[in-house]
Amino acid sequence: MANIKSAIKRAELNVKQNEKNSAQKSAMRTAIKAFEANPSEELYRAASSSIDKAASKGLIHTNKASRDKARLATKLG
């Protein structure tokens, strides 16, 4: 464990951020799986929105977000 006060704070912050990022990615995956189980316009919009949110927060690359959304759109159409 770190001895310097600022390093201790950063270590605690890293844990919190990791939990938050993991939850966000998990929610994205859940939305995608829900759409794939039952493709509908409403579930597509929810999945697309969650993908965009993850990309805007830097959890996934923007190109991956575009690729995932395109693949979902082909399943919808």
Swiss-Prot record:
GO terms for cellular component: cytosol; small ribosomal subunit. Pfam families: Ribosomal_S20p. SUPFAM superfamilies: Ribosomal protein S20. Binds directly to 16S ribosomal RNA. NCBIfam families: S20. HAMAP family: Ribosomal_bS20 (MF_00500). This is Small ribosomal subunit protein bS20. The lineage of its organism: Bacteria, Bacillati, Bacillota, Bacilli, Lactobacillales.
